[in-house]
């Protein structure tokens, strides 16, 4: 049997993180700033933006260069704790 601590990923790897939040002019910039605390290589080329059909929400996919499970956990904690963020997948 495999260990609980074994990862399904081989690090380093590119890892997409999906973030949803209320539409705001600075949403994408703010989220990139949060993610850059953990991956300073994130820039506009690694971010996809999609508005919701009603325009009330914005979805982002930010692809980070993940170096460890701990790094991913830290990113998820920072994003889920941010007041502009509704959902992180």
From Swiss-Prot:
Q: Which SUPFAM superfamilies match?
A: YbeD/HP0495-like
Please, which domain of life does this record's source organism belong to? Bacteria
The record's annotation in InterPro entries points to:
UPF0250_YbeD-like, YbeD-like_sf
A Pfam family hit: DUF493
Family, per entry:
Belongs to the UPF0250 family.
Q: What is this protein called?
A: UPF0250 protein Bphyt_0500
Organism name: Paraburkholderia phytofirmans (strain DSM 17436 / LMG 22146 / PsJN) (Burkholderia phytofirmans)
């Amino acid at each position: 049997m495999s260990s609980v601590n074994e990862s399904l990923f081989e690090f380093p790897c590119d890892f997409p993180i999906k973030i949803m939040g209320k539409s705001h002019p600075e949403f994408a910039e703010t989220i990139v700033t949060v993610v850059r605390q953990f991956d300073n290589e994130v820039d506009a080329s690694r971010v996809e933006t999609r508005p919701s059909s009603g325009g009330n929400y914005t979805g982002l996919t930010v692809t980070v260069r993940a170096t460890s499970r701990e790094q991913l956990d830290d990113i998820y904690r920072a994003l889920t704790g941010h007041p502009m963020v509704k959902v992180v997948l």
